[in-house]
Every structure is written in C-alpha cells, then in structure tokens.
C-alpha cells in the first residue's frame, strides 16, 4: 500500500470511528430494557434477519458490510428489477445496458461496466444457490422482485463463504418458500406509460397452499411484464424498437416431516426477450438509434434446487444441490464495416452484415455444511462445495447472400461459397466448448472472549480448473480444415478472513475486518477479431480492509452506520476492446479502491420514515497500464463502472386518515464515471457515464386487502447515462428509462 493511500485510509478510519462515537454516546445513555420485557413500539425500525454468514442473524449484528432490501420495501417503491432498487444500497452502482449483460459494481471493483469476456466481480445467488457458473457467465440474473422475501447485498469480497466471482461483493436473492402454516395468495397488476413508448403492463400472481398443515406445502409464482421500447430505430423504420418482455415463475415445495427436518425444493424459470438493443446514438437525436438489423437479446434461466436442513441438536446440517441451465443469444449490426470485408475479400455483399453471439451452459452444484447452534460462546461452521459447468459459446459473422458473394470472389472462386457459408449466410465462425470446475473446503469460527468482544477467523481452500476447446471455421481457414485449439488452466489457493467486533451495548457495535476475494482466469473467445489478442487471462485476487460501526439510538428510532474501506487489487483482469469492436480479457497491473459508506434510517413516529445513504469512494489504477491497440492509461485513472459519489434518499409519510394514504419520494444521485479503460488513455474520447439525479414519487391508498398506487418515475425526464460503448454505428449510450407514469393494484389474501 502506498504511503498516500495509508494516510487517506487512516483519515477515513478516524472519520468512521468519530461517526460511531457520536452515535454511541446517546445510545449508551438510553440503553433499552431487555428484549423480553421491552414493550413493542410502532416507531421502532424493522429488525431484518439475513443469512450473510450462512446462519440467520440480525443485519445489525453482522461484523461486515451487509444491506437488505425487504420484500415490503421492494413493493413500497414499486421495484421490478435491479435498476429500481440496487443503487439504494451504499457503495453500489448499476451499469444498465441490456438484459443479461447489465452489471452491478460494488465498491468500484470492475474493469468494465458490462458483463463481457469473463467472470464478473459480483456474485449472484438465489437462496444461497450460486448463479455465477465457473468462468465466463452466460447471463447475469436479474430476478423479478415479486414475492421475494428480501434481497441481501454483501459489500466487500465474500470469497471465504461464497467462493469465486464475489470479489467486490455478492447479491443474494431470497425468495419466499412454501409455508405449511396456512393459505396465502397475492395478485398484482400494473399499467404504465413511458415517454416515447406504447403502454406497458405487467401481471403477477402467487398462491401458497398447505397440503397438510405444518407438514407439506406448495407455493407457485407466475409473472409477465411488458416494457415497451422508447428508442426509435431509424435504420429499421421502427418506433419503440427496444421492446422487452419478461416472463417466468417460481415453484417451491416444502416438506417438514418432523420439527428437526426440512426439505425444500425451489425452481426458477425466467425468460427475457428484447427486440432491439437499448443504447441510443446521441449524435442522431434524443431517443434515436440506427442499425440495419434488429439487435435482439434473448435470455433464458432455468434452475432447480433441493435443500435439506437437519437439526442434530449439537449442530445443524445443510445439504444444497442444484442444477441450472442458461442460454443467451445476441445479434449485433456490423453493416458499417461491410465495406472493409468487401474490399479485403473481393466480395460484393449488399445486405446487412451482422454478428451472432451467445451460448448456453449447464451447471451442477453441491454444498454440504455443518453449523453450530447460535448463541454459544464459540460458534463454528464447516463446509465443502463443488460446482461444475459445461458451456458452448459461439461467435459468427454473416450476411444474406454470402455464399454467392464468395463464389464470385477472385480470391476464393466458384464452389467456395458452399464450403465457407454452408447455410448461405454465416461465413466465419468461432465455437468454444468450455468446462469449468470449482471445489472448496471452507470454515469459520467465532469466539466470544467476553459478551462484548468477538473474534471471527475463517478461510477457504479452493481449486479451480477451466478447459476450453475452440474451433474456427469459415473463410479464415479455407481451403484447409477447421482450426482446433485447446487450453487448460488449473489454479488453487487459500482465502483467509479475520474480523473483530466490540459491542459495548445493545445499541452500538464496532468491527474491523480483513477479507480476500478471487475469481477464475478465463480464455478469450474473440476469435473473429482481425487483431491478435492474448490467449486469455489468469486469476486475480484482492484484499479488503475495513472498519465499521453500527449504532442505534433514540429508543430504536434512529440508526446511523459508517464504514471505511481500502481494497488492494493485484493482477487485475482487464476487459478491453479491439479496434474492430471485439472484447477480450488479459491481466495487468494493480488497482485500489478506498472509500467511506454512510447510511441512516430515522423513524420519529409511526407515520414518517427517512432512509438515506452517502458513499464516497476512489477506485483507481495504482500504476501505469499499457492497453493493447490503445496506449497507456496513467496511474490514478478511474476504474470503469464506478462513481466517486453516490447519494440515495427515501422519504415516506403515511397520513393518519381513512385508507392510510402514503406518499413516498425517492432520490438518487450518481457522479460521473467512465465505462471502459480504453477511455482512460490520454487523447481518447472518453466513454462517460453517470452525473445525474433521479426522482420518483408514489402515492398509495389501501382499501382492505387491496393497495392502489399511483406512481411517477424519473419525474424530471433525466437522460442519465448508465453505460457508454463504442459501437460500429456510433457512440452508444445506455440510459435510464424516460419519465414514466402508471398505476399498480396489489391484492393480498
């Protein structure tokens, strides 16, 4: 760590501790009575239980940076997807671009604002089932929020308990499972109108049926959402070309044969179909894009999991097995560079040139663990896991009439078209068969020296393996045979974790934490690029240091939290782009991220509530970085996908009158950032993002079991740029959805 970084970190730590002391003085003076004698208070803030440490505990007791958005909070703000809520948590930026490739960045740990070429830096889980397969992630899951119990956001590396890809942090979707104690049902319908778009709608339903009371139950969820397009594609002559439809559901079966045994089955199916890409070309106008072909994106996720929880008394045993299948198919317009193919290959292509890209994966995971009962002086956890995946990735370039064009080429001649483009269109393709494995032994122990002081020590011994066999066919190998290459990487290591917490009262906790994270190295699949690229990237790792405090005061009506962190990142995996717009991965250099996260929750009475968070961070290169084909990004350059400042506010007021009218105002601010490291090279045109404010307003009234909500999103119609990418047809900007008004009806049994 550099001396300057030391000084900045120490200043941040002092500020965090000062904030904690300011909150702790009144908390000690007003210590609450024991829980068993305390009278319930409607003004107390909600107590949220999380499983961040793979055991249930209050979010206020976790010696780490954990936030949780409850199912009720998701409903209150009308959240449908990650874009609606994830940035409300400290230290998190959502780089929205296209379904399946939009990317969550935690604490600035990223080298691209999108999910391109390799394993990401944020882990995704559904009820603790990993959704990031080893190596390249086919689809970044964005699970519909209907009937979720909560979404847990773990900031900082989670490699000890959650494995690879959780370098920056993890997101754990917690879905409600079947409840055998009674019948339940819910229905929700939404109609909305977005500027420059058709009318949107959504319909969702849930039913929970106890087959045998307290023994066996089934819960089913179904949803459909149509988000109409708001971009006009002048090349296609289509208004609102970027229509997106999301459909799917979940199924849960829970069997509790006795009080010590629980079997839980959970299935997820979700399909997202986007008719066209969601980036605009600002040089052409406000909400305008221009392509010769529709750039569709189709994604499918299927997951089945079976979980056994067995209470032995002296320990709890958990076995969690899963099977998942993902598929993603894209199309990109390459027509603007058709002229170069015609010139270099003596072709006369006149139809649009396109790239088809995507893949599918099948993954299987198993985790076994023993956990001691909570509340003892020594708590421990021991576990083992295994995850393997088989993937097929493809990249193919084509155009209608390609076979005929090659037959007419002086470089290839008659008869070549049938060999080069057997389907008549695809004339160069690159296929990769990838197998990935991850296995690990992990454990964690917490010892309470006194009721106030606790020490936690943990570690993960892991081994990873990736094998890839790639095949290239088309004009680049003609007249020879297809070119087949194979490569394999094996890596192993150990991730430690140490934390120390001090809880002088029920209302105050201080903690210090050191943890590590890692992710797989990956081979490159940009086989169609005309430029030479590295064969792939090796694994990278980081170390996270943080100090934090959680304080509760004013008899439980106010919570103030502060965290200071410093992340040291080495051998960083870079996500870069060739001059002909293909993404590739390599390793290089060092980086750091340091910052302060502040959050507050205040509920002075049972009518008003204010939730707020402020994050300051600096995620920067720690040394000069040479970028192939681009130049050198100097030390101190900003890391992509991050912002130095983010501010979030949620104010809610419930009027004390008939129908309980409730008014909720939310605000988000995100400072400027860049979308890729190529932008950091002096003289390059920066791909910028961020620097916007968003305001949403909701008004809800309750009529018995039915809530009716009127809402307005992006009230100022801000063109907040969430990601910028250099496309062949111009600089493309992903933007937040334009101003939207609508109404939602929610009925609960």
Model-derived segments and their meaning:
Residues 119-121, 132-134, 145-150, 155, ...:
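Outer-membrane beta-barrel translocator/receptor signature
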Residues 31, 373, 380-381, 448, ...:
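Gram-negative outer-membrane beta-barrel transporters
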Residues 668-678, 700-749:
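C-terminal beta-signal and adjacent terminal beta-strands/loops
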Residues 254-259, 268, 370-373, 385-387, ...:
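Structural signature of Gram-negative outer-membrane beta-barrels, strongest in the C-terminal barrel
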Residues 1-79, 83-88, 208, 259, ...:
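N-terminal Sec signal peptide and the immediately downstream disordered periplasmic leader
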Residues 94, 103-157:
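Periplasmic plug
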């Amino acid at each position: 760590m550099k001396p300057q970084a030391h000084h900045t970190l120490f200043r941040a730590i002092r500020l965090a501790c000062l904030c904690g002391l300011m909150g702790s003085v009144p908390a000690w003076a007003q210590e609450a009575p024991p829980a068993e004698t305390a009278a319930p208070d409607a003004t107390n803030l909600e107590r949220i239980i999380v499983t961040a440490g793979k055991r249930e505990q209050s979010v206020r007791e976790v010696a780490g940076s954990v936030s949780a958005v409850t199912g009720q909070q998701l409903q209150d703000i009308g959240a449908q997807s990650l874009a609606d809520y994830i940035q409300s948590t400290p230290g998190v930026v959502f780089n929205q671009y296209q379904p399946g490739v939009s990317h969550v960045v935690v604490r600035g740990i990223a080298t691209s604002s999108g999910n391109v070429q390799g394993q990401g830096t944020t882990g995704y889980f559904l009820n603790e089932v990993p959704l990031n397969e080893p190596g390249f992630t086919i689809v970044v899951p964005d699970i519909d929020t209907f009937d979720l119990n909560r979404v847990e956001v773990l900031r900082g590396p989670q490699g000890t308990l959650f494995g690879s890809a959780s370098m920056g942090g993890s997101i754990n979707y917690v879905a409600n499972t079947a409840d055998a104690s009674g019948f339940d049902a819910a229905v929700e319908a939404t109609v909305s109108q977005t500027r420059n778009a058709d009318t949107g709608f959504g319909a969702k339903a849930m039913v929970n049926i106890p087959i045998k009371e307290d023994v066996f139950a089934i819960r089913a969820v179904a949803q459909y959402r149509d988000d109409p397009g708001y971009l006009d594609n002048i090349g296609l002559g289509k208004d609102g070309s970027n229509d997106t439809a999301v459909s799917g559901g979940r199924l849960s079966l829970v069997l509790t044969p006795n009080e010590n045994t629980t079997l839980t089955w959970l299935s997820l199916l979700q399909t997202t179909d986007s008719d066209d890409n969601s980036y605009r070309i600002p040089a052409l106008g406000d909400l305008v894009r221009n392509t010769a072909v529709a750039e569709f994106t189709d994604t499918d996720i299927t997951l089945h999991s079976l979980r056994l929880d067995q209470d032995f008394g002296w320990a709890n045993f958990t076995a969690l097995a899963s099977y998942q299948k993902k598929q993603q198919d894209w199309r990109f317009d390459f027509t603007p560079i058709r002229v170069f193919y015609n010139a270099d290959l003596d072709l006369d292509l006149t139809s649009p040139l396109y790239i088809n890209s995507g893949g599918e994966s099948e993954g299987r995971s198993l985790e076994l663990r023993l956990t001691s009962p909570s509340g003892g002086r020594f708590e421990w956890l021991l576990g083992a896991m295994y995850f393997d995946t088989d993937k097929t990735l493809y990249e193919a370039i084509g155009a209608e009439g390609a076979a005929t064009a090659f037959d007419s080429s002086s470089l290839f001649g008659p008869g070549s078209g049938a060999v080069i483009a057997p389907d008549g269109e695809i004339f160069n393709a690159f296929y990769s068969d990838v197998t990935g494995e991850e296995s690990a032994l992990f454990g964690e122990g917490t010892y309470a020296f006194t009721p106030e002081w606790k020490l936690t020590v943990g570690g993960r011994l892991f081994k990873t393996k990736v094998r890839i066999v790639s095949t290239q066919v088309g004009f680049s190998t003609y007249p020879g045979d297809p070119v087949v290459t194979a490569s394999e990487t094996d890596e192993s290591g150990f991730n430690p974790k140490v934390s120390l917490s001090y809880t002088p009262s029920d209302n105050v906790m201080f903690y210090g934490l050191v943890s590590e994270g890692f992710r797989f190295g990956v081979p490159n699949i940009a086989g169609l690029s005309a430029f030479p690229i590295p064969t792939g990237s090796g694994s990278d790792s980081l170390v996270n240091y943080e100090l934090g405090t959680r304080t509760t005061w004013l008899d439980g009506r106010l919570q103030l939290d502060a965290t200071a962190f410093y992340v040291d990142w080495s051998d960083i995996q870079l996500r870069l782009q060739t001059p002909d717009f293909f993404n590739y991965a390599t390793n290089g250099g060092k980086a750091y991220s340091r910052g302060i996260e502040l959050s507050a929750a205040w509920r002075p009475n049972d009518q008003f509530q204010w939730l707020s968070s402020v994050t300051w961070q600096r995620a920067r290169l720690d040394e000069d970085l040479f970028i192939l084909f681009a130049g050198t990004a100097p030390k101190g350059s900003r890391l992509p996908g991050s912002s130095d400042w983010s501010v979030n506010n949620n104010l809610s007021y419930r009027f004390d009158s008939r129908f309980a009218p409730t008014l909720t105002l939310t605000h988000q601010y995100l400072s400027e950032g860049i979308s890729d490291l190529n932008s950091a090279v002096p003289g390059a045109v920066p791909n910028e993002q961020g620097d916007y404010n968003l305001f949403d307003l909701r008004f809800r009234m309750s009529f018995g079991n039915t809530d009716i909500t009127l809402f307005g999103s992006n009230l100022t119609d801000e063109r907040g740029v969430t990601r910028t990418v250099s496309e062949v047809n111009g600089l493309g900007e992903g933007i937040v959805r334009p101003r939207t008004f609508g109404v939602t009806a929610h009925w609960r049994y």
